[in-house]
């Protein structure tokens, strides 16, 4: 059973051995995607998954620590990673108008991203009209303002709310409450920094059947806090802790149908852009025959921001 106290120690105890230490001068991933911007334009978005020190918060569902370093990376390492990303994008064609700097934690954690790298990174992505970084709500403040002032384009900060269910949020070990999240969102609004919110579909500790209800309530809370976009992430296993919670009945993985329903229901709110996370969706699908078409449909809805008819399948019986 999941403990009431010392949750971080329990979470860490479930981990498998770390992979080989990553090179602090090489990004974990670099790719391009298409995203509908706040303006309504569908544009190229360059994504770089930065290599840096593990996040100091140990959320029960997180597996991103597997590709992080144990120590802070040297000054200049992040700038070199971004330089490699820009070179990769340039080799693929025109540079993207939006850049996402994701780092398996918080961009504003100085132990993860040295503040001395902000200026050289900003210079390297001066071509970007819009830049997205991610952060823990408790780290939103002066460093966010500093980065905003260095960028040529506008700044957006993605915050992982995960859920607006107070009891579940506490058990996730996020170590903030809804009031603290709302204050971070207010700081961003005052500083004219856009807000994106990450939400989980079927987080652990929810009553059976309450997943859709609470992802909609969580989206309503996020939009009320000023979010211009929410990303719906199906809760995954793979970090040890989630497997234990599944075995104890405290977590039931979402299905592809539940992700589709969440996207449809949150989009129907009409409050902002809604993106379904389609990374590594195969484990959530029960039918290999219609999986690719259903994933493509989710991605089309992401781009067009309008609901589409469900994908029929003669094999699994979907209408």
Question: Which residue ranges define each predicted feature?
Answer:
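Active-site-proximal loop/turn and secondary-structure-junction residues that shape catalytic pockets
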Residues: 105-107, 137-139, 163-165, 201-205, ...
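Distinct, well-ordered alpha-helical segments
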Residues: 111-119, 140-150, 208-209
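Core AdoMet radical
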Residues: 65-81, 85-113, 124-140, 154-181, ...
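Conserved C-terminal portion of the radical SAM core fold
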Residues: 179-241, 259-278
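Hydrophobic faces of well-ordered beta-strands that scaffold small-molecule active sites
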Residues: 44-46, 97-101, 131-133, 155-159, ...
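Auxiliary Fe-S-binding modules of radical SAM enzymes
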Residues: 1-27, 33, 37-38, 223, ...
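N-terminal pre-triad scaffold of radical SAM enzymes
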Residues: 20-69, 87-101
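Acidic (Asp/Glu)-rich catalytic clusters
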Residues: 88-94, 121-126, 144-154, 186-192, ...
């Amino acid at each position: 059973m999941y403990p009431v106290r010392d949750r971080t120690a329990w979470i860490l105890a479930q981990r498998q051995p770390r992979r080989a230490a990553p090179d602090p001068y090489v990004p974990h991933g670099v790719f391009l995607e298409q995203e509908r911007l706040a303006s309504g334009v569908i544009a190229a978005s360059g994504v770089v998954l930065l290599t840096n020190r593990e996040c100091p918060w140990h959320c029960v569902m997180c597996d991103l620590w597997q590709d992080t370093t144990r120590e802070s990376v040297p000054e200049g390492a992040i700038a070199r990673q971004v330089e490699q990303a820009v070179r990769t994008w340039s080799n693929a064609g025109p540079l993207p108008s939006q850049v996402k700097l994701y780092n398996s934690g918080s961009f504003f954690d100085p132990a993860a991203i040295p503040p001395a790298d902000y200026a050289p990174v900003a210079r390297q992505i001066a071509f970007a009209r819009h830049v997205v970084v991610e952060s823990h709500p408790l780290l939103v403040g002066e460093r966010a303002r500093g980065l905003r002032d260095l960028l040529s384009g506008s700044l957006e900060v993605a915050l992982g709310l995960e859920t607006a269910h107070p009891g579940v949020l506490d058990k996730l070990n996020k170590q903030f409450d809804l009031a603290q999240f709302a204050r971070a969102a207010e700081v961003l609004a005052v500083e004219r920094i856009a807000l994106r919110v990450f939400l989980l579909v079927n987080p652990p500790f929810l009553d059976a059947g309450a997943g859709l209800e609470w992802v909609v309530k969580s989206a309503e809370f996020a939009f009320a806090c000023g979010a211009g976009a929410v990303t719906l992430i199906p809760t995954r296993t793979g970090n040890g802790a989630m497997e234990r919670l599944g075995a104890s009945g405290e977590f039931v993985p979402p299905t592809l149908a539940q992700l589709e329903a969440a996207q449809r229901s949150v989009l129907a709110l009409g409050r902002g852009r809604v993106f379904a996370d389609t990374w590594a969706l195969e484990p959530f699908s029960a039918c290999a025959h219609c999986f690719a078409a259903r994933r493509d449909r989710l991605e089309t809805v992401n781009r067009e921001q309008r609901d589409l008819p469900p994908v029929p399948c003669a094999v699994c019986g979907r209408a």
